Each structure stands twice: as C-alpha cells, then as structure tokens.
Swiss-Prot record:
The keyword Kinase appears for this protein: no
Name of this chain's protein: DNA-directed RNA polymerase subunit beta
Subunit structure comment from the entry: In plastids the minimal PEP RNA polymerase catalytic core is composed of four subunits: alpha, beta, beta', and beta''. When a (nuclear-encoded) sigma factor is associated with the core the holoenzyme is formed, which can initiate transcription.
One BP annotation, GO: DNA-templated transcription
Source organism: Buxus microphylla
Gene3D superfamilies: 2.40.50.100, 2.40.50.150, 3.90.1100.10, DNA-directed RNA polymerase, beta subunit, external 1 domain, DNA-directed RNA polymerase, subunit 2, domain 6, RNA polymerase alpha subunit dimerisation domain, RNA polymerase Rpb2, domain 2
InterPro entries, per database record: DNA-dir_RNA_pol_bsu_ext_1_sf (IPR042107), DNA-dir_RNA_pol_su2 (IPR015712), DNA-dir_RNAP_su2_dom (IPR007120), DNA-dir_RNAP_su2_hyb_sf (IPR037033), RNA_pol_bsu_bac (IPR010243), RNA_pol_bsu_CS (IPR007121), RNA_pol_Rpb2_2 (IPR007642), RNA_pol_Rpb2_2_sf (IPR037034)
Localization per Swiss-Prot or TrEMBL: Plastid, Chloroplast
Amino acid sequence: MIRDGNEEMSTIPGFSQIQFEGFCRFIDQGLMEELYKFPKIEDTDQEIEFQLFVETYQLAEPLIKERDAVYESLTYSSELYVPAGLIWKTSRNMQEQTIFIGNIPLMNSLGTSIVNGIYRIVINQILQSPGIYYRSELDHNGTSVYTGTIISDWGGRSELEIDRKARIWARVSRKQKISILVLSSAMGSNLREILDNVCYPEIFLSFPNDKEKKKIGSKENAILEFYQQFACVGGDPVFSESLCKELQKKFFQQRCELGRIGRRNMNRRLNLDIPQNNTFLLPRDILAAADRLIGIKFGMGTLDDMNHLKNKRIRSVADLLQDQFGLALVRLENAVRGTICGAIRHKLIPTPQNLVTSTPLTTTYESFFGLHPLSQVLDRTNPLTQIVHGRKSSYLGPGGLTGRTASFRIRDIHPSHYGRICPIDTSEGINVGLIGSLAIHARIGHWGSLESPFYEISERSKKVRMLYLSPSKDEYYMVAAGNSLSLNKGIQEEQVVPARYRQEFLTIAWEQVHLRSIFPFQYFSIGASLIPFIEHNDANRALMSSNMQRQAVPLSRSEKCIVGTGLERQAALDSGVSAIAEHEGKIIYTDIDKIILSGNGDTLRIPLVMYQRSNKNTCMHQKPQVQRGKCIKKGQILADGAATVGGELALGKNVLVAYMPWEGYNSEDAVLISECLVYRDIYTSFHIRKYEIQTHVTSQGPERITNEIPHLEAHLLRNLDKNGIVMLGSWVETGDILVGKLTPQTSKESSYAPEDRLLRAILGIQVSTSKETCLKLPIGGRGRVIDVRWIQKKGGSNYNPETIRVYISQKREIKVGDKVAGRHGNKGIISKILPRQDMPYLQNGTPVDMVFNPLGVPSRMNVGQIFECSLGLAGGLLDRHYRIAPFDERYEQEASRKLVFSELYEASKQTANPWVFEPEYPGKSRIFDGRTGDPFEQPVIIGKSYIMKLIHQVDDKIHGRSSGHYALVTQQPLRGRAKQGGQRVGEMEVWALEGFGVAHILQEMLTYKSDHIRARQEVLGTTIIGGTIPNPEDTPESFRLLVRELRSLALELNHFLVSEKNFQINRKAA
C-alpha cells in the first residue's frame, strides 16, 4: 500500500481493526468461496439432483441485540439463507426454495463474538507457510546432509534428500524413502520427460540400475513400488483402482495440496510460472526442487531461515471461520445425500427444505468457539486487556507447535520481527516466545504475511510516501531505525545512522538509507507502548510491566497518569468502554443510566452500562460526562467507562512514593502504605460476583422455588421475598440463602414414621418429601445484592431449565496482602498499613503514601521508574501532564535526565520550595521520620509514581479451615480453597518439624488433624469440656490404606500396637 502526503498526517490504525477486517473478509469472500465448492448431489439412480444457487445467498439481521444475547445467554448470530433447487431429471421439473442453512456467529466492531452469552475472541495463529524450504544438517559422521522440505497447505511434510553419492531420495515417511525417479513416474512422468525438464540429467541417469529402471518402466510399476514403500506392505501388491484411490487419499491429498499461498511460494522459490489456480504439487515442481537441491549441494544457492517471517503465514480469524464453514458444508452434504437416499427408498417426495437441516452449521460453530484452542474467552479485566487480547499471535494450536517441544531458536527474537511482532510483550512461563503481540502498525496482508509501514526516502520526489512492506521485501532495503531520527534535517543528512539490511544491523551514511521508520512506537505492542521511559528499563522488566498492566483493577475513582506516552487516549477509545457520540446534536436529558440526544430532527436514546460484571468479576460502569443543554459534535465522549478519565486510559493512581528502607517492612519487594489510601478510597474497587441456580424437572416432579424451607433457621431466610428469591439491595453474609429451592424425592420405606406406613397401607397414599437444595452464599461472598435475573427459556423443558442469577457487589479497599505494581515491572505485596502520622513526611509536612525498597531498582535495571517518579513530582506541583515518546535521546544526549531536572527546577522556583530541586543531590530530598520528627540520615528519592492495584487480591486467596470434607479413600482433608480443603503436611514439612523437635505437634498433624477418624471425633468433645486429649490407640486411615494396597499385591502385613501403658508397667516391674 502506498500513501502520498505529509508524514505528520499519518494516524495510528484502530487497535481492533485486524479482527474486524478478518471477519469482514470471511463474510465477503470466504463464505462465497466455500459455497461455490458445494457439489451437486444425486441419488444412486441419478434421478434426482440437488444443488445450491449461491449467487443470491442472504444473511438476515440478528433477531436480538448484543445486550440481550449476554443477558439471556444466547448466541449473537445471523441466519444464513441460500436458494436451493431439486431437479427431477426424468420430467425436467425443478422445485426451488430458499432454505435455512444455519446460524453464523457475528462479530462486533471490537472484534469479539458472543456465544452462549459469553464474549469470545479468536486469536491469530502463526504457521509455517506452505512451500519448499532447503536446510542443512550434520549426520552422525559430521557430513552435511542437504534436504528440501515440502510443506502442504494442511501441514503435511515430504522431504527430498541428497546423499554423498549425489543420489536424490524422496522421504515419504520417517523410515521409508524412495527414488526421486519412482515418485515422478508415479505422478505421471516418464523417464524422457524427466530428463528433458531437469538441469542436471547426468546426475539423474547415474544412479538408476536395471532394477530401478524396471520400477520406472511404466506408471503402474512406479505406483506399486511407491505404494509398497509408503504403506510398508510386504509381498507383491496388484495394481488396482482402489489402490490408486487409497494412495490419492492418504498421500497426495494430505501432502501435495499446496493451496493458493503454497503455489505462490513454490513459484517464487523455484522460478516457475505455473498458474495460481493449480494448487496441487506437480511433477514439474518435484524436478525443479531436485534441481535446486543439487545446486545447493554444490554451493549454487542459499539455504532458508525457517524462523524468518517471510517463511511464516498468519492464520487469521477469516481463515479459521472459513475452514469451519467448509467443514460444516461437508457434513451438510453427507446429511443431504443420506436423506435423499432414504426418501427414494421409502418412495417419498422430497423438497429442498426437507433435505437440509441447520444442525451441521450451528453445531460446528458452537463446538469451534467452545473447544478450539485459538478461541478464547475474552479477558475483560480492564479496557487495555480487551484490546490487547485480540492482537495476540500464537505459534500454538492445531498444526502449530507445543509449549514442551518448541526450541529456543523459535522462541527467540528474529530481526524480521521488527515493526511486526513486539520484541517485548510475550507470556511468561512455558509459552514464552510462542505467544506474542502484534506491533501497533502491523497489519495482515493479502497472502497471510505481516506487513509493516515505512517512509520511503526519495530525493527525486519531494512527497513522502508510506509503503507497507512484507518481510520478504524489506530485507532488500536499507531501513533506518526510528530512534536515530533527528528533527533538524540538515544535521540528519550529515550524520551516520544505524540501519538494518538483510537481517543485519549496520552503521551507514544517511544518503544510503532507502526507508525509515514512521513512528517511535512502531516496533512495540500496545502494552509496551504505554510504558514511559521504556528505553531506560531492562527488557525483562518491561515484559512484566506490559503483562501487569493487563491485570490492573478498575478503581472506583480513576485518575489519569501525570507521565504518559500519548497512546492512552487511543487505547481507551478503541476499547469501546466509553460512550461516543455518533451524531452531533444537543443533550436534552442525562441520567445515570441513559443520555438522550436531539439532532437532525431525531431523538436518540443512548443507554449506559450500569454495574455490569466482567468475566474477571470486575465492575464495568459508565459515568456521564456531558451536561444537559450542551451541544456536542460527532466523536465527542459522552460517558467515561471503567478505568478511563476524560477519554484517556486510567488504570491506577498518582501517589507520593519514597524509595527508602523502613524497619524491614519493605524488604523483598514488600510495600509499606499509609492508611490514607484506605480512608480516602484511593485504591478502592468494586467487584461483582455471579451466583446461579437452575430448576429441573426430576422423575419425582418439578423443583420448586419457594421461601418456605423447613428445618432452616428464619435468620438465613430473612432476605427472601414471597417468591423465594433474595431481594434487591439486601446485604448478605456467608451462609445466607439467596434462592430457596426444594427438590422432591421419595423416602425409603424404613425412614417412614409408623403412622405414615399405616396411611400408605390403608389409603394407598404415596408420602413424598422434599430435599432442600437452596443456593447459599459461599465463603468470601458477602456483599450487596445489585441484580437478580430470572431467565425463562421459551418452551421450557428438561433440556431448557429455568435459570436464576444473583449478582452481588463487593467493595474492596486495599489491605495487607494485596498486590500493587508500577509501569516498570516494580511489583510488590502490601506488608503493613501505617497510620498517617507515622509515615515519613516531606519538608512541607506532606506524608508519603507508599514506601518502596531502593534495592529493587539497581539489580532489576528498571531506572525508568526513577525518571517517572521525579517528573511526576514536578507535574503534580506545576499541575501539568507529560506525554513522552520513547528514545528521546534521538534529540540530544541525556535528554530524559535534562527534561526531568529542568521541570524539577521550574517547580522549585514556581512553588518557592527549594527542597524540590537541590543541586547537591538533584531528584532527592531530606525527609523526616513521622514517629520521632528527626530527619533521616540520607536524602531520599521522592516523587509521584503511577501505581496500579492488580487483580491478585488477598480476599480471593486467603483461606482457613477448622473442619470440612474428607476424601473417601484416604479420609484426609480435601485439597484446594474451592473445596474448603486443608493444608497438606508433606514429606519436607515433616522434616522441618522433626528438625525443631516438636514431636507432639507433628503427631497431632499426622493423626488428629488428618486421617485418624476416631481420634479427631474425640478431640472436639475434650476441647469443649476442657479435658486432656487422649492419645490414639489405633492406626490412622492412611496406614490401613497402605496395608490394603499391599494385600492387593498379595503381601500380608501384620501389625500390632504398643501403648505407653505397657511401657510404664514394664518399667515398674523392672
């Protein structure tokens, strides 16, 4: 793509554009391509023919809105209608109907789909591009073995190999290989055609002996030999049509279909001119590949870099949806074929509508969105998370790599990633380097390659052109790096700049540069582009920061950062959490849940999101930002969403921090905070939890929702209304009943009272009882009920039960154990909340909000936090906000430090506070101990940093158990917080207790508190009475389990117990 115009006018593309454009490409092109492949279907007697007329297919508008689909747990989809005809060949009559094929899930403008009420997203996959690749490996003798690997469109591989005697083999399986002549002959070429189409016929003539010549004497012999080697069949197989079909299905269709992209790559690599619509591997391809392999063997050619992005292709959402649509049509074809045969067999008159069912298409897409590894639940923790999730690229998935087998070379950064895949933003752990994030300006090209924009430097034309180049093209240009550009063009032309050429980094004169970067953020992802002073941070810490920003919780009172990078507004806008005016007009009414706009004679009602739950239990809420009577323009922000302020991303708070040790409470990345952060609700967030229950029709009758629950205390039922559902606005505690439900059941005969048995015997009355199956609030769920939804499916049946959902809001203040982090990888856990009077305070009396450990900076090499901290202090005093692009050293040396010191100096002058900038130790200040009032010995770095509260909160993780459930086999406490489990005392824990000599505590942990059934029952009673706990006199259950397992191995283990009494008696007798 080439754009003319001024370089200052280039804009950042929409962050959700890649997903939405891919879906539009599927609707416009992929849908039609697959429908055209649908064949004409005939019955066995060839009397009836069924076909689709795909030129006039229709996609109906969805019957429900997005909000209703989420509310009722439905799929937001469109119905596909295609005209179909049924032709009777004997009478030449045709019956035509428009039939319903199925539902296709739609995608909104943010790149997400709603399936069964859940937001889902399909991420892009990076695969090896189909074609041929030459590489060299060393065998066990240390000799180079050259191979050419042919990769099909489906991922199947075949290899051409040349040995030390210059003989060429085709490896059709891991163990079997055949001569290249046999393969070419089996594909339809004779020896004369082979020799006429190769550059080295003497090499091809040198190795066939009499036996080989017999094998390639005819096509049938070559096919038999090829089948024998491929299928590993012994004996002498006989040539037949079924043998050819089996070979065609198992080998040629899986390993020889190159596809559109593979044909293009094959033509370019081997200098062929085969038409693009010929997507299968031809004998001509095999011979040209063998010629190139011989040339590479003798030094005339280059090997391929398998990790270069020019040898990769992006499998986007369009390709995945098209593959699933083709699979659904194959299933539909089989169903139609079977229905036609059944109708003819039973002498029925079929119609097009009766032949087609919507089940194949609907179930295929539901299983794809629900089970496919590349279809994931959209992470909606905060607005940044939503847009970053859709820009992920993964090497994993079907046809790709696995986290355990991928090598370090694949995970590593490659020079071709420049401007296409972010070198910083990747996942941590086993998938590091395999799941990346697309760079800001990257886009997916027509051939599935990642393209990046550059400015072309031309002296002939004064206009600046912007080119989008694929990885195979930009390696032929000298590309200047974006961080080497100067504002003064006169100086720029004289300087020597770093550039990239053929995957190498060089230093060249400016006159030799062909292209240059268009933007300093061009090679970073969105997450990395939001880190100020990123050039002063270690890459590992920048990676942690870009990951932790996606874990930030939206706060109740958001605040935009003092020091930013300028992309905060674009990120908030593209996330879709803010309400944007689509038309200009006048605000005639505004409320907490809606805005009414009047313009062009129409009145438009804009509903706002009210306390909506995300799938990470965070609160999504919109706040109106316009007043009644104001005139607005198109594109203006009407309401801020969660974690946005004034249309800018606001994930954290600007707090006053100090880098100093404080009584050891901030060692090992712990953080000391002031109680002001609690009392002033600075880090207070709202979380919404969903609890649901369903009513079924059992064999004993339907379940009932009621507030009359026997055998339960009235205190637990105090919040239920007359229908048995908790009332809105109620405050509920752990154990309270949210929905009262009774399940009918028939009691056993032995459990009846005597009078009940008499009634049954005399009157034949069946006495039924009900079991209480209420929805109870679990541990840690206390809060306020903000919404109750009773969803009744149409035509309710056993398969469509009624669902009741209760939404409870929790207000969480920051507390000890919560995790906080900055934007430079500086993370920590709250260790202590100090009273404000005990916190260190500045020279003007302001107490510090947070105290960080200074030892966390030099070893981690994330010095960017110090620049941000000092510049934030200046911005807070001057009431300024800074937006700084990275790599500002391209303007002058030490530009970041000079900017920070100049702003601190100006703040010191304007506020008449000389302590803000002291020349002896710039950036530091003398501060005082809040407990004693004495100054600390050393000056301390103080400033305002942007600190976020992360989703890892202590309320979700802390757990304690007094009693609970036990495992059936081992009789030991269950494992995990969700099951109210206990903490396991394992082998190493036992060693630790033994090391301290605490024998009685160890015995309690292994007996009373674990699996000694009788002893743990006696402990409770003796504890209440106040007596001594008796020693156990029998074995624990785990020992008995060991004995049983040994018996299952035919080993009898006899054991007996020796008590302390026996020892004491024997001791007295002695």
